[in-house]
């Protein structure tokens, strides 16, 4: 997991959290929750939350599976569907949990290299495989793949489960949720941790065809029927019901991101055109480690990976305008020494 520092004066831009609070209805839902209800087990099928998600996205209730964050949902998908002797495919620069789960569950895998511009090469995913998973937009690069390219990958893999991890989709790119009813091998996974400001509540979900969702539930129930607690369910229902707040918050983050691109580019940083809530930035004159350590000393925390193709890059979460100005000031002062 990413570092979780705890300083009163810190600027935390290292774990892609939303800098704004959850929808106001979330606080109301938690306040109104009956303490007496906590003596009862929660609903194992999370029907209230799944119904709210289904209504928001215009799908059927039986097409929704919820878990304790998208990590939980993705891990359950790996365990349920990636059981072939053939390797699963995912990018070489991507979400770090994919190889971890693969090794934990003894799933063979192949990393498909992104090109020199950190773009996914769709043709690399046409070979025989045991399944496919990738984020869109990708993490940590922020680059979004088109719906047409994703559909090409799905069409070339009719016998494989294709999981599109859309943790950051609300900040840019186009969701492939409309393809769910067209392809019965597609699973789309999203989270409440980013655009809905609820990383601390741990809510993720998958949308797919009812048959795959049924199998996911069977696998989940074989481990733990009660994975989501009552407070989380209540907060999740409230969060998903407020479309206007979601759109307002996302718009602020996107505006700050686009401004950050201009400011950091003027300082000499280079980065792919992120469609997410972070920038994947490198500087030709300063090492990523040097900048990371300098910022850390000032309690400004960004993500430094330090290995492989990402060793020269920092992943900078988009914070509030005030937080970003603190970052810019620290960088300018360092460059002007």
For each feature predicted by the language model, list its residue ranges.
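Active-site pre-lysine segment of PLP-dependent enzymes
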Residues: 119-128, 140-162, 166-198, 210-212
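PLP-dependent enzyme catalytic core of the Aspartate aminotransferase-like
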Residues: 148, 294-303, 307-337
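PLP-dependent aminotransferase class I/II
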Residues: 23, 45, 185-265, 269-272
